[in-house]
Structure formats: structure tokens, C-alpha cells
């Protein structure tokens, strides 16, 4: 259990030093426009969740940051999608953070969305990575 706690502490420290709630998407687009975008998306696709996923400097840049995912999708499935998009090597571990909290792999995205969505209507997920084998 101590090993898990140490990993979480190390990752949390890395995220808070690296990220600190910074979002390129938020910086580029005003709150009003983001709110308008999420409302349009939610009206057009009521059973989908608008997600913004951004990566740390240690991961390759995503070709797109906006995702529209089914409500019943598990976070581990979304993580798999992101791993494939950035072509992450198997020996690299990837972690998702929402509001600087480590996301559990078996969580349902709808629960995460309703608990942590931003005031603009998007859920912001930050992906970071560490090498697990040296």
C-alpha cells in the first residue's frame, strides 16, 4: 500500500508542478465561447459528454483535444483511446488527472463528468506519463 501511496504522491507532485490547472484550450478560447460550444454540443448530442484532453510535456501532443464520448464509457476505455492516438509505448505508464486528482481506471465517465465538469460545461482531463521500467 505504501508503494501505491508513494506513486500517487510522486505523480501528484509532478502534476502540480507541471500543470497547476493550466489549459491551453481555456487560454485560447473565452469562457463565453467555451460555454456556448458545450451547450450546443449537449443539445445536439444529449447522451454524449464533451471532454477536453491535454497532455504533459513528456507525452506527444494530441492531434485533437476535444472528444465527445458516450456517457457509459469507463475511464480505462478513454485512456486506451488516448494511448492509441499518441502511440504511447507499452513501457510508458499513463495517468489521467481531473482537477489535480488521480482518476481511477474503473470510473464511469458520466460520474466523473458530473462531479468535475468545469463551469464552461467541458470536463478537462490532463494526461501525464512516467516510464515504468527505468
Residue ranges of model-derived segments:
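Ubiquitin system architectures
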Residues: 1-134
Amino acid at each position: 500500500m505504501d508503494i501505491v501511496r508513494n506513486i500517487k504522491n510522486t505523480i501528484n507532485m509532478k502534476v502540480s508542478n507541471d500543470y497547476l490547472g493550466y489549459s491551453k484550450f481555456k487560454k485560447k478560447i473565452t469562457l463565453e465561447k467555451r460555454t456556448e460550444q458545450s451547450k450546443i454540443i449537449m443539445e445536439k448530442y444529449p447522451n454524449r459528454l464533451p471532454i477536453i484532453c491535454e497532455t504533459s510535456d513528456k507525452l506527444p501532443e494530441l492531434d485533437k483535444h476535444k472528444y465527445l464520448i458516450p456517457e457509459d464509457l469507463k475511464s480505462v476505455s478513454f485512456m486506451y483511446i488516448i494511448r492509441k492516438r499518441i502511440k504511447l509505448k507499452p513501457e510508458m505508464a499513463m495517468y489521467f488527472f481531473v482537477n489535480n486528482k488521480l482518476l481511477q481506471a474503473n470510473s464511469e465517465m458520466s460520474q466523473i463528468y458530473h462531479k468535475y465538469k468545469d463551469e464552461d460545461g467541458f470536463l478537462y482531463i490532463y494526461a501525464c506519463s512516467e516510464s515504468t521500467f527505468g
